[in-house]
Every structure is written in structure tokens, then in C-alpha cells.
């Protein structure tokens, strides 16, 4: 373990390798967790409303079973075809059996996980909190892509993330105090909850989902309430830019719904990495102005 402390490049390399390997599992989480949730909802509906004769699901699906397979020909993926990034490149982005194209997003998620984990290790160095922040980063990646795909932010991700942030503050592993962590979680939830109900009162429409409240609560628990204004501002700016671009490219009306969770996740991660620098720059800009 001393080698990791004295050779930072080794620590960064191992963190990147860990991110690469876990990134492969994140692809499974991103694809399967919404389907698992749907199966659970169907089962609950069938049990709660027997008068509607809802057929309960017969399929069994977990994050580990059954084995991953090609969505087109359903051939199980071989072990040598499951190496992050490299297998996709070796197969030229196609299934080895039916030659159906495999989405480039799979290696992208793996490479992104490796890159961001390496950045976290580089930024925070060899410390217990770094391991936690790597986990924090990986959960944000999974939540981002699930929200992009389904407009859902699963409680299975946001709630454990919130309680982990508070637990780290309680154990004094996190630099955030317990008081700031708890208040950050409460303020994060109530902030978007208030915006949601105000928007609904004024327009009669729902502007965001409850998953967004819980994700901001998790970010507040990890970073403290002081960073919430920055996260909200950054996520709003990024969301506005990408929303306008998407509206222009897809030529859809302003009524089109956009997931807000990815922008919260991006803003939260940026605040984690460079929040102090951004805050200093902003204050210096105000003083200089």
C-alpha cells in the first residue's frame, strides 16, 4: 500500500483500471435496472388489483442473471468478448455470432468511467475519501444514462447515495460536517420540491420528477448545502444549452420533456472537482467588477 502513496501514477492507473472494469458492470445496471423495476411494478399491480386480471411477469431478471447476451440473436456473450472497450474494438462493434451492430455507448461508458475515476484519484490523492468519491462518481454515471434512457432516477441509486454521504460525514471521513451534510440533503430535496409545486401551481404541469429531488438531496449530502446554489445554477445553464441544441436538431416543440438528472449529475461532479476554484473565481470576478 505504501507504493500507492509514493507513486501517484500507479494509484491513478489502478483507479482508472477499476473504473474500466466497473464501467462494464455499469452497462448492465443501466440496461437491466429499469427492466427489473418494471417487472416489480407489474408484479405489484397484479397483486394489488386482481380485479383487472393483470398478468404477473414470468420472467426472472437480476443484475447478475441471466448471462448477458446479444439483444438481437440472444447468443450469450463469450468471456473473451466481454473485456471492456477492447472486445468491442476487436469485434469492430458487431456481435460475433449475428454481426448485428453493438452500440458504441457500451465502450463509451466504460472509457468514461475509467477516465473520471482516474481524474478523481489524481485530484484527491491517496486517501480514504477518494475511494468513496470514486464510488460516488460511478453511481452518478449510472444514474445519468438511466435517466437519459427512461426519464427515471431509481431510488435504488439515489437513496443509498444520500445515506452514504451522511454516513461518511458522521464517521468524519468526509470533509463535510454532519450538520452541513444533513442540512444539504434536506435543502437539496426541498429546493426542487418547492420549484416543482410552484411550477405545477402556475402552469398545471409537472416540470420535473421526484427522482430529481432525491438526486439533489444526495449531492447536498456529499458536498454540503454551500454548494447547492452552484449546482442548481450550473445544471440549469447546461440543461438550457443542451435543451436548445436538442430542440433545434430534432425540431420538436417546446413541450418536449427533457431529463434533468444528467445535468444535476454533471453539475454535482464539476462542483466536487473544481467547486472551490469556481467559487473563488466568481467571488474575485464580483470584487474585481
Swiss-Prot record:
Zn(2+) binds at residues 70, 73, 95, 98. Its EC number is 3.4.23.43, 2.1.1.-. Its main location: membrane. Its cofactor is Zn(2+). Gene3D superfamilies: 1.20.120.1220. Disruption phenotype: Deletion mutants are unable to secrete several extracellular degradative enzymes including the cytolysin/hemolysin tthat remains in the periplasmic space. It results also in significant decreases in host cell cytotoxicity, adherence and virulence in a mouse mode. It catalyses: Typically cleaves a -Gly-|-Phe- bond to release an N-terminal, basic peptide of 5-8 residues from type IV prepilin, and then N-methylates the new N-terminal amino group, the methyl donor being S-adenosyl-L-methionine. Disulfide bonds: none annotated. The chain crosses the membrane at residues 10-30, 102-122, 126-146, 182-202, 227-247, 254-274. One of its GO terms (molecular function) is methyltransferase activity. Keywords: Cell inner membrane, Cell membrane, Hydrolase, Membrane, Metal-binding, Methyltransferase, Multifunctional enzyme, Protease, S-adenosyl-L-methionine, Transferase, Transmembrane, Transmembrane helix, Zinc. It comes from the Bacteria. GO terms for cellular component: plasma membrane. It is a multi-pass membrane protein. Zinc is required for the N-terminal methylation of the mature pilin, but not for signal peptide cleavage. InterPro entries: Peptidase_A24A_bac, Prepilin_IV_endopep_pep, Prepilin_pept_A24_N, Prepilin_peptidase/N-MTase. It is found in: Cell inner membrane. GO terms for biological process: methylation; signal peptide processing. Belongs to the peptidase A24 family. Plays an essential role in type IV pili and type II pseudopili formation by proteolytically removing the leader sequence from substrate proteins and subsequently monomethylating the alpha-amino group of the newly exposed N-terminal phenylalanine. PANTHER family: PREPILIN LEADER PEPTIDASE_N-METHYLTRANSFERASE-RELATED, TYPE 4 PREPILIN-LIKE PROTEINS LEADER PEPTIDE-PROCESSING ENZYME. This is Prepilin leader peptidase/N-methyltransferase.
